[in-house]
Amino acid sequence: MPEPVAEPALNGLRLNLRIVSIVMFNFASYLTIGLPLAVLPGYVHDVMGFSAFWAGLVISLQYFATLLSRPHAGRYADLLGPKKIVVFGLCGCFLSGLGYLTAGLTASLPVISLLLLCLGRVILGIGQSFAGTGSTLWGVGVVGSLHIGRVISWNGIVTYGAMAMGAPLGVVFYHWGGLQALALIIMGVALVAILLAIPRPTVKASKGKPLPFRAVLGRVWLYGMALALASAGFGVIATFITLFYDAKGWDGAAFALTLFSCAFVGTRLLFPNGINRIGGLNVAMICFSVEIIGLLLVGVATMPWMAKIGVLLAGAGFSLVFPALGVVAVKAVPQQNQGAALATYTVFMDLSLGVTGPLAGLVMSWAGVPVIYLAAAGLVAIALLLTWRLKKRPPVEIPEAASSS
């Protein structure tokens, strides 16, 4: 975790501008993820002639690589400082574009082309975990740990913005110049971000002996479990809301997803200081309550407007869960371990979103689509109870010896 430089208090606008000047590098990394997202499955299946399994695998490889590399990203951010980790991650994003470019140039050799695509996706996953984790810690180093919740919130906003922009733009670039043109755009985005990041001042890494991974996991896993349980609500809406609307015979599933995204981003923009004012655990419990109401409304909806209100509430409720619990999780370890803590905490959300789809699919095939929203509400209720117990637990003293050694 970087050592923040002591400075006079910043007003809200200047504070946000400083944060955005750093998290824009995460925006760039997620833009390189969003640009090919709507293109590659169709390219692998329809153009290259491979099965739907391979089309899905090409996309999934990035998420597996992100999941496996995220703990290493946090550890190296603590050891080397976040700026180096961000630049390393952006280089991975650049190399992923190079992989797509060479895959397009070797289209006459389908197996080679597919392997190059897969390699590019793996490199992108590693790059994203390093750029995402590093940009959060870099932002905290610039504005101070008091504002870690705001930094995490802004990182989420730029993530959603980049993904929302990237997918349609990627389709436009692909229709304009094929996979090679799309690859060059991705390489250009990453290269511009690298050139902007390199001249920026470096934030010093914290001194001190780092805790082993097992010790970090032991301090953050309960917060991670609450996050994982709450993420099930997001997972079932993002994955199955279209099937839910089809089962009901309604139109407007895409608009429901738009409502979720607007509520998610809007809540983060409307309540930037909520975590600092009333505490991360209090914010999390309020968010869980709102998310539960939203999921229950979707599950029992008999009219489209009920489902839309439910999705809106679920998006607003889930919005601040990650930063609210993340602030408390990161502060549960010494400063020199906070990068590893943030990365480890994030893994719980990655795992949750990975297993929610297939598990909810099994429940849906057995009991129907609406039941998965009621089940997700039950999981969020467990997260609420867990967070309430964490709030009642006496605070754990963080040993200073480790941070001053």
From Swiss-Prot:
It is found in: Cell inner membrane. InterPro entries: MFS (IPR011701), MFS_dom (IPR020846), MFS_trans_sf (IPR036259), MFS_Transporters (IPR050171), MFS_YhhS-like (IPR023008). GO terms for molecular function: transmembrane transporter activity. Coiled coil: none annotated. The keyword Cell inner membrane applies. GO terms for cellular component: plasma membrane. SUPFAM superfamilies: MFS general substrate transporter. CDD domains: MFS_YfcJ_like. Keywords: Cell inner membrane, Cell membrane, Membrane, Transmembrane, Transmembrane helix, Transport. It comes from the Bacteria. The chain crosses the membrane at residues 19-39, 47-67, 85-105, 107-127, 156-176, 178-198, 224-244, 252-272, 283-303, 309-329, 344-364, 366-386. It is a multi-pass membrane protein. NCBIfam families: PRK05122.1. PANTHER family: MAJOR FACILITATOR SUPERFAMILY MFS_1, RESISTANCE PROTEIN MDTM, PUTATIVE-RELATED-RELATED. Belongs to the major facilitator superfamily. YhhS family. This is Uncharacterized MFS-type transporter YhhS. It comes from Escherichia coli O6:H1 (strain CFT073 / ATCC 700928 / UPEC). The gene is yhhS.
